[in-house]
Amino acid sequence: MKYIVAIIQPDRLEEVLDRLTEKEIHLVTVTNVLGRGRQKGISEVYRSHKEAGSLLRKLKIEIAVNDDYVKQAMEAIVQGARTGKIGDGKIFVLDLHDVLRIRTGETGKNAIG
């Protein structure tokens, strides 16, 4: 089992969710986050004064998948999130040691679905 964490642009969420649904991946958690990468934040002009913000709004998508779905999940995220511009995001894949579905007590692969 793997735990996939993706950081994407907020305006790409619906596209990513559509691509995940096409691949039969439905269990997703989405969180608003702040962060920066190589683009190092943004600069805005407010009342003739240039203000630099070091953190940008992003979305964090978290998905627990069985090993058979890792490649499909990553492909779906890339297809939905990629614009070809700096700031498209990152995908991290982590080992997932165990899962417990609270309602039923199921563990492991059965708890993911």
Report residues per predicted region.
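Positively charged, small/polar-rich N-terminal and surface patches that mediate targeting and assembly
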Residues: 1-113
